[in-house]
């Protein structure tokens, strides 16, 4: 056989062998590389939400006072948050007030008590800024409070209820612990439906004063 043909055959055989070796090497590297996650982890919501999620949904949430009369269904997961600090203290105070008032509290009563702590709607506060905006917009938007008109009230009055996120992240037991700390009583001694005298402003003020100084869940 001519020398040129033999040389070409050797080159072709060598090239084929190199191709086989390259394919084997690529297959080996692919098997050793971890598979990328098909779904990226969800990022926390913009408002202090943590990584732990609950499958509950926000069912009746109004984002601003102007939308309170037309409550819309919002289908999104309720995420447990790491809501801390002075705003948490203010929130827990309002939740406690709502609970002891029979699961709802009129806005006038809330501001009557907050006013004794130096918080007036529309007036800047050194810690909270505009407290009305924090309570009626931020807490409502985040799902901690429901803020809506009192039925058949004239002139129109508003009242607060626990929001869906408050039910997820807190409980009436935690609120009773909070109130019991003010009263120096064990929460197990409290009946589930505490008969609260709405005229007892001193007790209400004591609860919110305690909350304003700081609260940590038991």
From Swiss-Prot:
Instruction: Please provide the record's keywords in A-Z order.
Output: Phosphoprotein, Tumor antigen
Q: Region Disordered: what ranges?
A: 1-75
Comp. bias regions, Low complexity: 61-72
Q: Where are the transmembrane segments?
A: none
Q: Does the keyword Phosphoprotein apply?
A: yes
Q: Which SMART domains match?
A: MAGE
The source organism is: Mus musculus
| Alphabetized Pfam families for the sequence | MAGE (PF01454)
Q: What name appears for this protein in its UniProt entry?
A: Melanoma-associated antigen H1
Q: Which domain of life is it from?
A: Eukaryota
Q: Where is the MAGE domain?
A: 1-197
Q: Where do Basic residues bias regions lie?
A: 1-13
Q: Which PROSITE patterns match?
A: MAGE
- Kindly list the positions at which Phosphotyrosine occurs in this protein: 194
């Amino acid at each position: 056989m001519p020398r040129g043909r033999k040389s070409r055959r050797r080159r072709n055989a060598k090239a084929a062998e190199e191709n086989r070796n390259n394919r084997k090497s690529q297959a080996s590297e692919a098997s050793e590389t971890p598979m990328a996650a098909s779904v990226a982890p969800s990022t926390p919501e913009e408002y202090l939400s943590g990584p732990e999620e609950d499958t509950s949904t926000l069912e009746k949430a109004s984002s601003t006072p102007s939308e309170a009369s037309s409550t819309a269904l919002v289908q999104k997961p309720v995420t447990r948050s790491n809501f801390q600090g002075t705003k948490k203290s203010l929130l827990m105070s309002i939740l406690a007030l709502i609970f002891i008032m029979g699961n709802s509290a009129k806005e006038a009563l809330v501001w009557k008590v907050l006013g004794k702590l130096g918080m007036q709607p529309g007036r800047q506060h050194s810690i909270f800024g505009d407290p009305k905006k924090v309570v009626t917009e931020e807490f409502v938007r985040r799902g901690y409070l429901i803020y809506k008109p009192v039925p058949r009230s004239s002139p129109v009055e508003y009242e607060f209820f626990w929001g869906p996120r408050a039910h997820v992240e807190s409980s009436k037991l935690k609120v009773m612990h909070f109130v019991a700390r003010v009263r120096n009583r064990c929460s197990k001694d409290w009946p589930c439906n505490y008969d609260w005298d709405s005229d007892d402003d001193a007790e209400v003020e004591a609860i919110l004063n305690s909350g304003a100084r700081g609260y940590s869940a038991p």
